[in-house]
Amino acid sequence: MNQAIREAYRTFVIFRSLAAVFRYTRPALDFRYIALEGPPGVGKTALAERLAAHVDATTVLEETDNPFLGDFYAERPGAALQAQLFFLLNRHRQQESLRQADLFSQATICDYLFEKDRIYAYLNLDDNDLFIYQRLYELLARDVALPDLVVYLQAPTELLNKRLRAREAEADAYRPNPAYIQKLNEAYQHFFFHYAATPLLVVETSQLDLTGSDDTLDDLLKQIRGMGRGTRYYVPRTRG
């Protein structure tokens, strides 16, 4: 009798432990590699970090330091190509290290898409510089893995500039010219209107709290989990 009680208690402890494991396991994603994209100020990095924490994924965050940016903003001759190539080589090095390390065995959320480099190149470079850039880009892009899903975060230019002004005040960061952000936002819209390399979720972020609301995060995860092939548009409804 005592043996039967001990066995029953042992079984109870095992099932209770398993229940605890399943209870606290973070929800998984079907997509192993997700890239978030959008213009400056849209909230890519903050969302990547929150999503990764929520689903126990690793993050790949873009390295934004560039010694040529000051000269580029000052419109010094040759600085645009120098800044663009520096970003391109940095992004390729980061993507190549990921591929070699096989980090995609765990879900990975990246706050940029490698192809976005061309958005800036076509906006910033003249024809001669663009010819040089394009030859190098085509060579490097062969080594870069495509994401399983791209999430394009949209926002009106006025909202982007408002967020960038707040960021500048908080961190003493450089804020690009509002007219440049307008052109960049339009370039992003054009790029993703024609994008077809991977499944694409387009998210209108004007009414989204990407930094604080768990409900917002849960709603977005539902959209991500429901993605199939092609492009889907998600325009959240305002609450209340």
Predicted region positions:
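Conserved lysine of the Walker
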Residues: 44
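A glycine- and Lys/Arg-enriched "phosphate-lid" helix/loop adjacent to the NTP-binding pocket
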Residues: 118-189
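NTP-dependent small-molecule kinase module
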Residues: 165-171, 179-240
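Conserved substrate/cofactor phosphate-moiety recognition/catalytic segment
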Residues: 53-90
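Hydrophobic anchor at the beta1->P-loop junction of P-loop NTPases
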Residues: 36
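Glycine-rich phosphate-binding loop used to anchor ATP phosphates in small-molecule kinases
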Residues: 79, 83-145
